């Protein structure tokens, strides 16, 4: 669903490399990237009905996010869970879901 540009934007936002003039990361950048990707997805559907879009979008964002966070923490699940704001058990379930365990 997402093109390589969107994956790159997610990566840069996750590791904090996109900054504004004030040096602050703007969540709006990620929102805009997701909006562009979903808009492109529907444009490619060419009028066909889409199903389970919510779950698809979540998995398309969640999988690379988890991958990047795990790389950033060098596989430390406790640190990764803290960064994500979830408990370690939830992180382990999500990693298993995407085959990252």
From Swiss-Prot:
Write the protein's name: DNA-binding protein Fis
Q: Gene3D superfamilies per the record?
A: Homeodomain-like (1.10.10.60)
Q: Which residues bind DNA?
A: 77-96
Taxonomy, top ranks, is: Bacteria, Pseudomonadati, Pseudomonadota, Gammaproteobacteria, Alteromonadales
Q: Tell me one GO molecular function of this protein.
A: sequence-specific DNA binding
Q: Which InterPro entries match?
A: Fis_DNA-bd (IPR005412), Homeodomain-like_sf (IPR009057), HTH_Fis (IPR002197), Trans_regulatory_Fis (IPR050207)
Provide the assembly information. Answer: Homodimer.
Keywords, ordered alphabetically: Activator, DNA-binding, Transcription, Transcription regulation
Q: What does this protein do?
A: Activates ribosomal RNA transcription. Plays a direct role in upstream activation of rRNA promoters.
């Amino acid at each position: 669903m997402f093109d390589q540009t969107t994956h790159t934007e997610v990566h840069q936002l996750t590791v904090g490399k996109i900054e504004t003039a004030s040096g602050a990361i703007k969540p709006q950048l990620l929102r805009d990237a997701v909006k562009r990707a979903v808009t492109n997805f529907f444009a490619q559907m060419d009028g066909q009905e889409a199903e389970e879009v919510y779950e698809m979008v979540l998995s398309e964002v969640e999988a690379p996010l988890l991958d990047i966070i795990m790389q950033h923490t060098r596989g430390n699940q406790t640190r990764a869970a803290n960064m994500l704001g979830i408990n370690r058990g939830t992180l382990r379930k999500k990693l298993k879901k995407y085959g990252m365990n």
